[in-house]
Amino acid sequence: MANKKIPRATAKRLPIYFRYLNVLKDANKQRVSSTELSEAVQVDSATIRRDFSYFGELGKRGYGYDVESLLKFFKGILHQDSLVSVALVGVGSLGSALLNFNFHQDTNLRISAAFDTKPEYANTVKSGIPIYPSEDMVKQLKEQQIDVVILTVPGIKAQHVADQLVEAGVKGILNFTPVRLSVPKNVQVQNIDLTNELQTLIYFIKNYTEDSIK
């Protein structure tokens, strides 16, 4: 089961389910139906049942899903049992905000190292996280065995930095730059373009709200 590939769309929804199951656990709720889950996470119940079906029988007809069992299952699937160290490259405004946030103990993810080209940042500590000079990046990533990097550098530098990350053996890049990176097939990239997301949101407001459809 661990090696079975599931659709990417399903994989993207798993953390959403996991987060809400944690909410249910904190509320001491013992079971949940696909309909209740659907209303909470805004994914239709048929899609939820199909997503869950990739992993076998996770629930019981007429009973729903046992929250504790489902939470334990997804914790394993999402590799939440061990701490994952993440690096951040680019300590500008966005990078600094992410360092301050540092996932706030909500997950098993921690930013444990940061890198920047600015000399005044070299060998300093921000929000409890050491900042290294960019020339030490490849060495530090290898020594600290960091596989995942958050990229918040200016777009003009993005591909060059990505090439260095590949050299360092990084397996995943969360890319906040507007550049679509060219990387080997064994490196996963998730693109987050805040400008695109806002433009899409504005388009939806103008074209898909009740006031705009007349």
From Swiss-Prot:
Residues annotated as binding NAD(+): G90, V91, G92, S93, L94, G95
GO BP term (any one): negative regulation of DNA-templated transcription
Keywords noted in UniProt: Cytoplasm, DNA-binding, NAD, Repressor, Transcription, Transcription regulation
Gene3D superfamilies: NAD(P)-binding Rossmann-like Domain (3.40.50.720), Winged helix-like DNA-binding domain superfamily/Winged helix DNA-binding domain (1.10.10.10)
Annotated Pfam families: CoA_binding, Put_DNA-bind_N
GO molecular function: DNA binding; DNA-binding transcription factor activity
Primary location recorded for the protein, binned into one broad class: cytoplasm
Subcellular location as annotated: Cytoplasm
Source superkingdom: Bacteria
Regions recorded as binding DNA: 16-55
GO cellular component, one term: cytoplasm
Subunit structure: Homodimer.
NCBIfam families (alphabetical): PRK05472.1-3 (NF003989), PRK05472.1-5 (NF003991), PRK05472.2-3 (NF003994), PRK05472.2-4 (NF003995), PRK05472.2-5 (NF003996)
Function of the protein: Modulates transcription in response to changes in cellular NADH/NAD(+) redox state.
Family recorded in the similarity comment: Belongs to the transcriptional regulatory Rex family.
HAMAP family in the cross-refs: Rex
Protein name: Redox-sensing transcriptional repressor Rex
Source organism (scientific name): Limosilactobacillus reuteri (strain DSM 20016)
Lineage: Bacteria, Bacillati, Bacillota, Bacilli, Lactobacillales
